[in-house]
């Protein structure tokens, strides 16, 4: 019996199918490898840094450098980023700049070749070496450091890199453009340091509005976990515990010339833990106004007044979005001034708001009341035979608070040495307030 031979072309077709199958498998494996390589290539790198969303915090032992490198380089379409200093920590050794893709994470940005960085602790620029040159001012909590590449640099092999502080240009430098691009980097070097990273930040134009923002910043003597934007204060802290207080304290204390200020709640945030009041100049940055000695404050969330204690007393109504809270001092006529240049010239100030009119009326009533009782007070002092404590003599005042133009209450207080400074505290995420430190001036 004769065997039937299979056609040769059938065997060849099966071999072709088998080869195609293996080629397809190899192709799929190759695609997977390419994707893995690309995923690894565009992956953020960090060491001794704790990353929580856009928040970076130092997570090393004392003396160890912490370094973070973003996953993608700056491009012509995205040529700028910013870093907000949430907490400057023990030494404030925070660096912001640009580095090559595989930069060593054991060194601060700017220390090694082909990298550059602006260092917050000394205001110096480090450009490829561990020795920096004076570049700008030092940066603290609440400040924003920006870094970018001029768009024209992407068309050539030389990068013109510029830095900003709080939206205003500080200076620029030139360095070679790395083949893989220059990546945003943040360095830290001491306990407690924490920043917020804004990779999609935009640099606004330096116009009159920027100059106005800078002038408002000059009114503040201390800022902790608070950002200033014109008259607006924004909370930048974590809002997770009672020590995450954002504090803003005015540069100058209240006086007989400027004795009142106001705060409007723009955004109550998560809990509306907003407080305004008065505090001594060296008031702790992690304590809400009113909680520690040398301070008194009205708290929006519960309507209580706190006077040098963590326990408040019922005082007034709660405050919500859109409410205007005010605080001022009624100075007696025998008040001992800190400086000879201060006088009660504020009687002739121009009144601009209902709140201000109410404040003026209360002040006048107080003076009239005081003049009518001066003789009685002197007689009582003679009968009692008691002397006023030296540190209290001539320093006693009445602190008052307002809500939407109405005075809601008063509190006797003794002005600490150096004066009572307008102080605002915030303690929950999203809180924003608008401040007017001089509502009685016209």
UniProtKB/Swiss-Prot annotation:
Region annotation Disordered: where it falls in the sequence: 371-394
Top-level taxon in the UniProt lineage: Eukaryota
Gene3D superfamilies, A to Z: 2.60.120.920
Span of domain B30.2/SPRY: 17-204
InterPro entries to which the protein is assigned, alphabetical: B30.2/SPRY, B30.2/SPRY_sf, ConA-like_dom_sf, SPRY_dom, SPRYD3_SPRY, Ubq-SigPath_Reg
SUPFAM superfamilies tied to this protein: Concanavalin A-like lectins/glucanases (SSF49899)
Amino acid composition bias (Acidic residues), ranges on this chain: 372-390
Pfam families linked to this entry: SPRY
Protein name from the UniProt record: SPRY domain-containing protein 3
Organism of origin: Homo sapiens (Human)
